[in-house]
């Protein structure tokens, strides 16, 4: 992993990572620790994913804001990073994970005497579907078309509104689709990994792949962006994080199959419908991330697919 170019952490820097045991949170926690930050790992469940960090078992969306504020104060947290995901399928589940949680988090931060910086990781899908070949810039007016995208946008707007009102020091990263180590099984790539592991040359696996092109980022590159954001003076802004490339889903699957080492006859690929939380085309304009954070993606998709295969979700 390349050295980061941001400012060194201040003495006594402690970062609370919410969602610390998920694919993104686990990688973010490790990256922060490597750069000298103390990490308070917050998640509903602990286990090996939280090893090496101070851990607090907590459902942030379920606790009163005052209780969360006391926890953050007790651990002298200087920055909160929200990488909670939520792969719920119902409107109620999405509102709980994407809106209720952020409402309580923002309220908790405002209750603290020494208010920590708040970094919220949102989604590129908040912008809604866009036409090829548009590169999605931060100035694009969001027009989300799915419940997932609408609730994710609502969560991001809570952070941005509170920052504009001077109640928090917040910043939103809008990340593209994530791949790499421990990609969640609930995602398309995670599901493909499970299918490939069950493949048999005598009984080929059929994969239905949409005719779509999407931007994907290795979770380790996303983690570097989060670390740089923690020490950046930027506030009140949205910053896109991606590779800045739209890759055909079939090409991505081909890279994953190659990483698996399976013979070609073990896989049969068929056309499938576009079933996305956003749209069939995503390509992030990532110039602002370079200007504000000194960040750029470093890991190739081939490397990311090897890591996706070699280090599956627990």
Cite the ranges covered by each PLM segment.
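Active-site beta-alpha turn of Rossmann-fold NAD(P)-dependent dehydrogenases/reductases
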Residues: 84, 119-122, 145, 174-176, ...
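Short-chain dehydrogenase/reductase
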Residues: 95-99, 134, 140, 145-153, ...
């Amino acid at each position: 992993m390349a050295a980061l170019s941001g400012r060194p952490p201040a003495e006594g820097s402690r970062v609370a990572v919410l969602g610390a045991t998920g694919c993104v949170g686990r990688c973010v926690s490790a990256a922060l620790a490597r750069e000298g930050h103390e990490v308070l790992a917050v998640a509903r469940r602990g286990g090996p994913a939280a090893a090496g960090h101070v851990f607090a078992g907590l459902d942030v969306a379920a606790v009163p804001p005052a209780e969360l504020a006391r926890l953050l104060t007790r651990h002298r947290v200087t920055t909160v990073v929200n990488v909670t995901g939520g792969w719920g399928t119902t409107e109620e589940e999405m509102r709980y994970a994407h809106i209720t949680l952020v409402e309580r988090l923002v309220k908790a931060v405002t209750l603290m005497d020494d208010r920590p910086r708040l970094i919220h990781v949102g989604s590129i899908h908040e912008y809604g579907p866009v036409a090829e070949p548009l590169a999605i810039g931060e100035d694009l007016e969001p027009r989300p078309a799915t419940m997932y995208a609408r609730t994710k946008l609502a969560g991001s707007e809570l952070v941005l509104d509170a920052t504009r009102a001077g109640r928090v020091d917040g910043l939103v990263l809008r990340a593209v689709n994530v791949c790499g180590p421990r990609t969640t099984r609930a995602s398309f790539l995670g599901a493909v990994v499970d299918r490939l592991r069950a493949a048999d040359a005598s009984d080929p696996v059929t994969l239905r792949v949409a005719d779509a092109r999407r931007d994907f980022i290795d979770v380790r590159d996303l983690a570097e962006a989060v670390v740089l954001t923690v020490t950046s003076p930027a506030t009140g802004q949205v910053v896109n994080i991606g590779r800045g490339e739209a890759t055909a889903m079939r090409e991505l699957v081909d890279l994953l199959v190659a990483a698996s080492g399976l013979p070609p006859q073990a896989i049969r690929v068929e056309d499938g419908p576009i079933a996305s939380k956003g749209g069939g085309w995503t390509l992030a304009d990532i110039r602002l991330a370079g200007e504000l954070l000194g960040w750029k993606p470093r890991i190739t998709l081939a490397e990311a697919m090897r890591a996706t295969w070699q280090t599956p979700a627990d």
